[in-house]
Amino acid sequence: MKPKRTILCADGNEQALSIRKILLETRGYRAICCTRAEQALEHLRDHQIDLVIADLMLPDLDGSRLIEAVKIASPQTPAILLSTRLNIFEYETHADVFLPKNAQSSAELLGHVRALLVRRRGPRKTLVAPSVPRTAASPNFAVARA
């Protein structure tokens, strides 16, 4: 059985956090939930985190600043920033993906989670058969015509 990917979720809204936790865990991910950025940074130091999902409006720190701290500590960790504010682009953010909090569907969020985790892992390795020299006896032999 492959190990579960760990996703760190930070949101000041406990109800939104519990919904997100259920959504992620029913899809086979391990979700660590925090209501404060300080807690999230402690978990980042203590655990291997594969992805971060943060709300822009956290009680103790701006979510984009949390993601900036994540990227400084672990540059390869992908991050999704959620916000009810649509003018997020006025912020300089280090997030890989921005999703409007009220408009996002579960399928959209999960699609971004999967895509970012695949991008972090890299493409699946495919086995390549060793090259066999082509000869006149092989069925793939081609003759160049002049």
Enumerate the predicted regions with their spans:
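Two-component/phosphorelay signaling modules centered on CheY-like receiver
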Residues: 14-32
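Alpha4 helix (beta4-alpha4-beta5 surface) of REC/receiver domains from two-component response regulators
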Residues: 65, 81-111
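Acidic, metal-coordinating helix/loop segments flanking the phosphotransfer/catalytic sites
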Residues: 33-51
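Acidic catalytic/metal-coordinating carboxylates
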Residues: 36, 62-65
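Active-site residues of response regulator receiver
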Residues: 55
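The feature encodes the CheY-like receiver
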Residues: 59
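Non-catalytic signal-transmission and effector/linker regions of two-component phosphorelay proteins
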Residues: 1-12, 107-146
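Short amphipathic alpha-helix used as the core "switch/output" element in two-component signaling
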Residues: 42, 64-76
